Regions:
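Extended ligand-binding groove/face enriched in aromatic
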Residues: 246
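Extended, loop-rich substrate-binding clefts of extracytoplasmic carbohydrate-active enzymes
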Residues: 1-27, 113
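Acidic/polar, glycine-enriched structural segments that form the non-catalytic walls/loops
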Residues: 26-31, 41-204
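Alpha-helical support elements that line or immediately flank enzyme active sites
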Residues: 202-233
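Conserved small/polar residues in nucleotide/adenosyl-binding loops
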Residues: 235-242
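Short alpha-helical segments and helix-capping/turn motifs at coil-helix boundaries
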Residues: 20-22, 31-35, 127-132, 211-214
Length: 246
């Protein structure tokens, strides 16, 4: 079962086990958090996580190769690893102690049907460094975090809940439009405020920003955001060229 009223949520039934998965991206960090809850179970249950890694541009696919750095380091409740030079470390952590089993392996021939429909390359190989195992009890929640910086694992639950509270629930047509507009807010630095031109190809483009700005702020009762973006464009960019296109 799938729902997305507040955040994407999927309910799974496997035999006598029922568990849910919710996920959110951090608004201001390069981080995804996934929340697993064991809704029902009739016996001892262990969750096993296999992270599939690509370390590539969104515009490209990757293939199995011998250049991968297969090393990793243990961090609080998880590990960090980096497949290739020049990329940031990837921190994978949980809100409770887990066991990591090192088992490097390539999963070949993963397919993306939508890309195939569009006539683009649609098959790639993904690297899996191993797997995490963690026991879970009925009613218990486990939160997984993946990001380019370490996180205080004791705060993961609070961080997740804060992200959920900041979301606009899709309970009306207006709220759906408001939610969509908010997804384009972009803050590369703490004092910055922009609008992205589109996902995944575009970044900040002045013409698109000015066209979309009133509808993405004033029309959803957010004049503060409008003023902050205008101030950022007019006064904080170092040159007229930077104010026009980035």
């Amino acid at each position: 079962e799938y729902s997305s009223e507040t955040v994407p949520r999927t309910l799974y039934r496997v035999g006598g086990v029922i568990f849910s998965k919710e996920k959110v991206f951090s608004m201001y960090e390069n981080r995804i958090m996934i929340k697993y809850t064991l809704e029902d179970a009739h016996s001892a249950t262990t969750l096993r996580f296999r992270p599939f890694l690509a370390f590539r541009s969104v515009k490209n696919l990757t293939q199995a190769n011998g250049n991968v750095n297969q090393s990793y380091e243990e961090v609080t409740n998880g590990i960090k690893t980096c497949m290739y030079p020049g990329y940031p470390e990837l921190y994978m952590q949980f809100n409770k102690k887990v066991k990591f089993v090192y088992e490097p392996y390539w999963y070949n021939g993963i397919e993306y049907p939508k890309e195939q429909e569009r006539g683009y390359p649609y098959q790639e190989d993904l690297y899996v460094p191993g797997y995490f195992e963690v026991p879970i009890k009925k009613g218990e929640t486990i939160i997984f975090s993946a990001g380019d910086s370490a996180v205080a694992t004791t705060r993961l639950k609070a961080l997740y809940e804060n992200e959920v509270v900041a979301r606009t629930p899709r309970t009306s047509f207006f709220n759906c439009l408001k939610n969509s507009a908010q997804q384009f807010y972009f803050r590369p630095k703490e004092d910055d405020a922009y609008l992205l031109a589109g996902y995944p190809w575009f970044k900040v483009r002045a013409r698109d920003l000015f066209v979309a700005l009133p509808g993405s702020t004033l029309s959803i009762d957010d004049p503060v955001r409008f003023e902050k973006i205008m101030h950022c464009l007019l006064y904080t960019s170092p040159s007229p060229r930077d104010r026009s296109v980035s």
